């Protein structure tokens, strides 16, 4: 895995961009979604504070085929793993993301759970129940979740 070690329930979507993974993760339009990155190598340019779309990651998690820890970019400040940990965001790696994208494009978005293998049986049952109960993105007030707060 990559990022924060935790389990989440969300809608699975995909992104086919070859670059811009940091911008995608911090894009508020991905709120309450787990992003499947179709491009196989994610993390090659690291992350930095200039390329944020917002101050936090609104995606619930990400799926990456092959993460790259050793970034190659003079502007980079953190690798992707550290960036995800800092933003409390989990990820899973080693998945055939292109196959998953084909499946999603044919069948539509799915509600899924990204589960940490270290979860105990009771917590795993709670996650399964959360997945059953989660109603998806429909009727969620996402604007309230992603909007800046009045000061």
Question: Where in the sequence are the language-model features?
Answer:
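RNA-binding accessory domains that recognize and position tRNA/RNA substrates
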Residues: 1-151
